[in-house]
């Protein structure tokens, strides 16, 4: 299936996701990914999401972030005027883009909808990481900060005037 996927679609990366069943049967997804990663010209990245094990739906956010960090993000070469923003379905994209452009002279890098593999490979070069929800972005924010020094903005929820102003100040302080 993986070889067929590559031949048919020529993706820039292939994520091999596990399931409850593969977790129970003990399939060697890592071994398959390692073998095919050596064979194909694109990264083949295992994503472990055996739902029976955790029973916590939000762990899927951390699992996807881990896969991106391990298989796609590259060490920084130079800083870019982008701010990583993880939100649901790129909600409020025009408004966030306008605010980031006008207030911070930076572009938002929305995660993950519509982001390319090339864009994701540069997350370590961006000015900061922000999120609309700690549950959604804590793993990514902490990992980028600890591994590459990209500040993770931790503020109160940006709802309401006080929350929104605190969020903007947190971004400003970080960059």
Regions found by a protein language model. Give the residues of each.
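An N-terminal assembly and electron-transfer interface module characteristic of large anaerobic redox
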Residues: 1-175
């Amino acid at each position: 299936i993986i070889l067929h996927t590559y031949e048919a679609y020529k993706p820039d990366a292939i994520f091999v996701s596990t399931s409850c069943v593969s977790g129970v049967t003990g399939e060697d997804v890592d071994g398959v990914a390692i073998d095919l990663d050596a064979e194909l010209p694109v990264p083949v990245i295992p994503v472990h999401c055996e739902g029976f094990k955790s029973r916590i739906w939000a762990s899927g956010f951390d699992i996807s972030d881990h896969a991106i960090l391990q298989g796609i993000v590259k060490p920084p070469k130079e800083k870019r005027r982008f701010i990583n923003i993880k939100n649901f379905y790129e909600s409020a994209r025009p408004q966030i883009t306008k605010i980031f452009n006008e207030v911070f002279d930076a572009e938002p890098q929305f995660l993950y909808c519509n982001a390319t593999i090339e864009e994701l490979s540069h997350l370590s070069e961006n000015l900061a990481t922000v999120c609309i929800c700690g549950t959604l972005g804590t793993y990514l924010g902490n990992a980028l900060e600890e591994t590459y020094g990209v500040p993770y903005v931790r503020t109160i929820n940006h709802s309401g005037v006080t929350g929104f102003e605190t969020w903007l100040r947190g971004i400003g302080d970080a960059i």
